[in-house]
A protein has these predicted regions:
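Cell-envelope/ECM-targeting effectors and their regulatory/trafficking segments
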Residues: 2-3, 44
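Exported/periplasmic cell-wall-interacting domains
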Residues: 3-35, 66-73, 77-138
Length: 138
């Protein structure tokens, strides 16, 4: 988020800024209480309470031929474990669109419309999301 690529390592200065709440991400919907944001231009999933982000994960959103829907949604359905499409611990927010783990999460839009996360991150993400929680995607 701080203009860094996924392969860069954060030095002490950047880590200190992040722990001081100055990590470089400005919450777009501070009046929404506890919620999730997905700014597709940054390819990240952000968990926030009011105007404070408390967790940020890298994602891969929908490619141009199968774009991710944008707008304001609520999480409506969950599916633990793997499904037949290789989606891991899915939490759906609109029809077949979900936040889910997947084996391939490049740093550019590559999915069929979902928000892909790393397999290792997804159980934590899945447990952070609650039914009816708002997600804002733009």
């Amino acid at each position: 988020v701080n203009g860094m690529s996924r392969s860069m390592r954060a030095g002490a200065g950047l880590v200190g800024k992040a722990f001081a709440g100055k990590g470089g991400y400005e919450v777009r919907h501070p009046g929404a209480g506890e919620h999730v944001e997905a700014p597709l231009s940054k390819q990240v999933l952000v968990f926030a309470k009011g105007d404070k982000p408390f967790a940020i994960y890298p994602i891969s959103s929908g490619k141009s031929s199968t774009p991710t829907v944008t707008g304001h949604f609520e999480f409506i359905r969950q599916e633990p474990g793997y499904n037949s499409h290789g989606m891991y611990y899915s939490f759906y927010f609109y029809g077949g669109y979900a936040v889910h783990g997947y084996e391939s999460v490049p740093d550019y839009p590559a999915s069929h419309g979902c928000l892909r996360t790393f397999i290792a991150d997804q159980p934590e993400i899945y447990n952070r999301i609650f039914f009816g929680e708002d997600i804002f995607i733009w």
